[in-house]
Amino acid sequence: MKNVKYGKCVRCGKTYDAVPDLTNCECGGILDIVYDYDYIKSVLTKEKLAKRENRSMWRYRELLPVEETTPDTPLRVGWSPLYEEPKLAQMLGIKKLWVKDDGQNPTASLKDRASAMAVAKAYEAGAKTIACSSTGNAASSLAGNAAAAGFKTYIFVPERAPKGKVAQLMIFGANVISVKGNYEETFKMSAEAIEKYGWYNRNAAINPYLSEGKKTVALEIAEQLNWEMPDYLAISVGDGCTIAGVWKGFKDLYAIGFIDKLPRLISAQSYGCYPINRAIQENKPWEPMEENTIADSISVGVPRNADKALAAIRESNGIAVCVTDEEILAAQRLLGRTCGVFGEPAGVTGAAALKKACEEGLIEKDATVVSVVTGNGLKDVANAIKSAGEPLHIEPDLDLMVKGFAERGVTVE
């Protein structure tokens, strides 16, 4: 790969050749992919990019760690819509707001970006089987992307994973193992199996290429905003891979001169599980936490990408905002009823944190903000019903309809 120099440990600084099956440093640290920005600047310009018809994450190949001969993955991942939301911006008391709906990806979450990268690197490695552990979205994204590309998958999920997400796995033909335990126990079992059977490792906390796939959401946002960067970007945080990838994407664009400023990150976590935000708020190393939140996709008590995530938040002079599950459900309703965007609880945690930050005066009135919705609401119908309530149940009688809605404070007209 002419555009990649090496993988570098974020903890000890040791470097490694960028082979397809690259994993953690021998010290246990996570690797970061280091690029040759001079080379990238010589082969990629804004004008060249603008002429490309490819509307997927692979339009940014010069900024991605793949060989020139590696084919694009079959499913169209990326280039999700970025909606300007003036009404919601006014409600929040800020200048401008955009909502990036990554629930529009093939398996309905941002994690398709990482799984597409995993499939590409598994192809380069000559692997036939890919495996991971997940609370749901990474699992379904791997299952779908791997199925389209002809790979076999083994996927480990904690038994609390929502049925809708597990159903996706089964439809995609994955070999699913539901583990009686929390995410950490599920992760350890997957790691043991991957080592024993030699499967390609899609675990984001181990495989440094996956955050490179996730960073494409930042590349898209910048291009969709015509390279005019927002002041803030709000996004939900679980193991830390996504927020680290977003920051890496913005820094890549800054390094090659495509943007002239970097946004501040708003790290959003639930009070039911917030090890990364607690480390920021208390200015100390992260510590494991119990997992107790409806936002299952970010319910990670042992965030193995914490080093990268914490560095990203601190480098950006970011804000760590925690919200309750009730505030998450309120944000789900707000986005749905104001923007027409249906996000799952973890997917709208960024929006919930943004709302809270605005209410607490942490965001300037003249600020411009992007809020990323990381997953579609249909992935967790049970909590959607809990959030929105039940429909009006009546006999087929219009008078009963009018009466029923009147009892709910709604006038039929």
Language model segments and positions:
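PLP-dependent amino-acid enzyme catalytic core
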Residues: 1-413
